[in-house]
A protein has these predicted regions:
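Active-site neighborhood of HAD-like aspartate-dependent phosphohydrolases
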Residues: 2-8, 12-60, 69-70
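Short, surface-exposed beta-edge/turn micro-motifs
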Residues: 5, 80, 137-139
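Generic detector of short, locally flexible boundary/turn motifs and exposed helical patches
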Residues: 21-27, 46-51, 56-58, 104-110, ...
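A short local loop/turn or secondary-structure capping micro-motif enriched for an aromatic residue
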Residues: 26-27, 100-101, 183
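Conserved phosphate-coordination/catalytic loops
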Residues: 36-43, 110, 175-180
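Conserved acidic, metal-coordinating active-site core of Asp-based
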Residues: 125-184
Length: 184
């Protein structure tokens, strides 16, 4: 960030970008997944983004993986130069990985890798999650058929563990200490 410039960190999903499940008339598709419309900006967001990027350095912060973030097609001239993905563990600069940031994030979670792998194996053996994956080797994510199944998956994890289980609708995330948007 240049001296004197303002950095505006903003959550991405359900703040600037909305899924097809929340699409409203007039929203603009900015993300495709396997050819299907996936993510949308409201018309107000499309109208305001050029003004925002002229005045501040916009830094989207998201739990999305790098691949998911890079699917977003920002309106002409509004693509942010940086983004924090993987819940703040991965910094992108001009679309490329900041290797120093990533190395620091890997060091932060080094002691929790074994536990993250156990969570991944345990969730993969369960019938509920339709998708279970490690995101950038920083945290584990599971998509369940409904919020009750997500709560069950989270509830079965050891409450004394330093790994936090966070439920968001039908999704559950398992974050090691230090992998959070606020710390980033």
């Amino acid at each position: 960030v240049a001296m004197g410039s303002i950095l505006f960190a903003s959550d991405l999903d359900n703040t600037l970008l909305f899924s097809h499940r929340h699409r409203q008339p007039g929203d603009r598709c900015v993300e495709l997944l396997n050819g299907a419309e996936q993510g949308f900006f409201t018309q107000e967001t499309v109208d305001l983004l050029p003004q925002v990027v002229q005045r501040v350095q916009l830094l989207p912060v998201t739990t999305r993986s790098v691949e998911q973030y890079l699917r977003i097609q920002w309106p002409a001239g509004t693509a942010p130069r940086g983004a924090l993905t993987a819940n703040g563990a991965v910094l992108l600069r001009d679309g490329g990985l900041d290797r120093d940031w990533y190395a620091q994030s890997r060091e932060l979670i080094r002691d929790y890798q074994g536990e993250l792998h156990r969570i991944l194996r345990s969730l993969s053996a369960r019938p509920e999650p339709s998708t279970v994956r490690s995101v950038e080797e920083m945290y584990v994510y599971a998509a369940c058929p409904d919020p009750a199944a997500a709560e069950r998956c989270a509830g079965d994890w050891d409450p004394g563990s330093p790994i936090r289980a966070v439920v968001s609708g039908r999704k559950v995330y398992f974050f090691p200490p230090g992998v959070d948007k606020g710390t980033a």
